């Protein structure tokens, strides 16, 4: 991982090179897995057509780049749900995503595909042979007794037997909430009692509201993200940017965003920087390995007898980006084989 000083030096170097390097004009999609600006627009048009949660944006006019149309400076999808933190996936296999990418280890810049969590030996130990299970012919004892309905006599014991007869049917009284204040019909309460009860109930509701989030850990805290895709002139690939909100629509802090990044990529391939078209801080996935990964996927398509299409580039791209942000559920649903 680069230090802050190294990152600053690298950014300055990239900006300098971008200014003097001509924009890619010849397609190298099949040879190198990169895009020209025109191919980026073509791929973005298909993405916005097939997945209408994505839109083209113009951004700040003062930050527009000349090699892209003014109304198509970058792609954006808003309010993308993120229901879980990455740490909650500890027992869920992500092999279906990890298998999509096999990149050779080229040192610090190599792309890391997360491995399924858990010990395979433990999984094997939990398997049970159904043939070894024994079935007991004995009927289990039950606490419910069935009795004949009482005749015309009014013996008090029969009342108890009636209760046993309906033992399996829950009584409404069983659902009595211990926190309910009103034990009597409010319509018959005196004026003083009604005032006291109302005040107490209001205080109780206020306390419940204050403690609701703290006391109930089962509440689903849904974060949302705005995700944008820009064209990176230096790397000649798309670059993904993330801006997150908590359940109260407050912007997430950088350390909170990293909770939604794959452990193998947080602080390594994901860093914080100013968005090139908006001028505010976003987290972004570093594009240094994007071309190599895309070249792998394009080659795999060719090996499987499929003709790679440059306009489908972003669907392949977003598919492998999901390895980095596995719990952020953005749309990239287009059926094709890789």
Curated annotation (Swiss-Prot):
Residues 158-186 have a biased composition (Acidic residues). GO terms for biological process: autophagosome assembly; autophagy of mitochondrion; glycophagy; nucleophagy; protein transport. Keywords: Autophagy, Cytoplasm, Protein transport, Transport, Ubl conjugation, Ubl conjugation pathway. GO terms for molecular function: Atg8-family conjugating enzyme activity. The keyword Cytoplasm applies. Residues 141-157, 192-210 have a biased composition (Low complexity). Belongs to the ATG3 family. E2 conjugating enzyme required for the cytoplasm to vacuole transport (Cvt), and autophagy. Responsible for the E2-like covalent binding of phosphatidylethanolamine to the C-terminal Gly of atg8. The atg12-atg5 conjugate plays a role of an E3 and promotes the transfer of atg8 from atg3 to phosphatidylethanolamine (PE). This step is required for the membrane association of atg8. The formation of the atg8-phosphatidylethanolamine conjugates is essential for autophagy and for the cytoplasm to vacuole transport (Cvt). This is Autophagy-related protein 3. It comes from Dictyostelium discoideum.
């Amino acid at each position: 991982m680069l230090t802050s000083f190294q990152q600053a030096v690298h950014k300055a170097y990239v900006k300098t090179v971008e200014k003097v390097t001509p924009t890619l004009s010849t397609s190298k999609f099949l040879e190198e897995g990169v895009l020209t600006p025109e191919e980026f627009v073509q791929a973005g048009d298909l993405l916005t057509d097939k997945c209408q949660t994505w839109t083209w944006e113009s951004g700040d006019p003062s930050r527009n780049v000349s090699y892209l149309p003014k109304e198509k400076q970058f792609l954006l999808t808003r309010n993308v749900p993120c229901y879980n933190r990455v740490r909650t996936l500890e027992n869920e296999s992500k092999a279906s995503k990890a298998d999509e990418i096999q990149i050779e280890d080229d040192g610090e810049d190599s792309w890391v595909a997360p491995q399924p969590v858990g010990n395979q030996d433990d999984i094997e130990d939990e398997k049970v042979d159904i043939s070894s299970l024994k079935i007991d012919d004995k009927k289990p004892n039950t606490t419910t007794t069935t009795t004949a309905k009482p005749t015309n006599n009014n013996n008090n014991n029969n009342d108890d037997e009636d209760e046993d007869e309906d033992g399996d049917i829950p009584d409404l009284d069983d659902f009595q909430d211990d926190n309910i204040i009103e034990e009597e019909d409010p319509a018959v309460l005196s004026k003083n009692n009604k005032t006291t009860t109302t005040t107490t109930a209001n205080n109780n509701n206020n306390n419940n509201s204050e403690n609701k989030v703290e006391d109930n850990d089962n509440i689903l805290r849904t974060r949302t993200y705005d995700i944008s895709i820009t064209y990176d002139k230096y790397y000649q690939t798309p670059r993904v940017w993330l801006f997150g909100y908590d359940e109260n629509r407050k912007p997430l802090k950088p350390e909170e965003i990293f909770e939604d990044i794959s452990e193998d990529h947080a602080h390594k391939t994901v860093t914080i920087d100013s968005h090139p078209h908006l001028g505010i801080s976003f987290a972004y996935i570093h594009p240094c390995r994007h071309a190599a990964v895309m070249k792998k996927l394009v080659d795999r398509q060719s090996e499987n007898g499929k003709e790679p299409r440059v306009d489908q580039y972003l669907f392949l791209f977003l598919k492998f980006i999901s390895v980095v942000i596995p719990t952020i559920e953005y749309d990239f649903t287009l059926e094709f084989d890789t």
